Amino acid sequence: MLQKALILVFAVAGIAGCVGCSTTSHYVYATLPAANELAVYREDPFSGTLTELAGTPYTIGDGAHSVVIHPSGKFLYVANPGQNENDISLFDILSNGYLNEIPPRTTVAPNGTQPALLAMDPAGNYLYVMNTGSDNISVFSIDSTGGLTQVPNSPFFIGLTPLNMVLTPSGDFLYVSVAGGQIGTSNGSILGFSVSSGALQLLNPPLTSADGVNPNGLVIDPSGSYMYVANTQSDSISIFAISPPNTPPGTLQQVIGSPLDDIYSDPFALLLDPKGQFLYVANQGSSNVAVYSIDSTTGLPTALTTSTSAFAFTTEGSPSFLVEDPNGNYLFVGNQGSSAGIQAFGVNSGNLNPLLTYAVGNTPSSIAVAP
């Protein structure tokens, strides 16, 4: 089964007149797996408005499911998990946002199947591919042309059904959330790896209980001190300190007060603002995005509230992914279900201002924004 990809929520600050906004346009890329397409939009830096580029969407690989952009802004990668593909597409990003595919596509076969999720280290040296059909992770080094070469001993075995993965900001550790019911407990777990030249080595101990069922959402704060886990079926958020004092590097230790009961239902995707001050939670069951402030000392989230209720912003459908634009000025929510599309918000100190919703023809599975 292909896993739902986390798409994106764009955090937005300074909406009124967009004070302090960059005047540079960014380009937004959305995968549409049912149509095997990649949609491309220009983001207006002052309003957050998205305008689809003429001649797009592009027809690309079978089941195109996850997209990631190189930190240089030069290259874009798409995972194609369909039975006719099992590969990664590479594109040059042109100055006007258009794409030029660079053949041939890079296969994850024969030892990898259904490459459903991509992640890249902050330096842009390695691409990590989560293969949900073979329960492993393929790792590729990236050369100066964007080309991919599989590192020695790749793919790296997980052995459990993976749901999501996240790298620390340093790129030294990678964590994979896995479904429960496989190791004698209904709770999901977090599998930890140290990273050296792209190669993965299991931490000791390798598994940490997520203390919740179906840990779909993962996010790490900008300092690399805390990891937040959305436990969809348990309606909770678990918080872990990363490498706390007197523990081996990479150790996860649940903080006091975790897990935190989510005030809404079915939390699926998480996003932290660039400063790590606010946590955004996409709740599929209640079709909204809740906002929490983060205690910088303990890492614990606290729901923001009005005089009568908690902050929650209604989405047009079932929100499945969140991503911010590079300037932290806009937040975009990927909605699935009968109202599939991309919903834009402006952000100001955690407050979300609904802007526009964009119908994309097919359900989006992921989004990336060029820096």
Describe these PLM feature segments.
Residues 1-19:
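Sec-dependent bacterial lipoprotein signal peptides
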Residues 18-371:
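Predominantly soluble domains enriched in secretory-pathway, periplasmic, or organellar proteins
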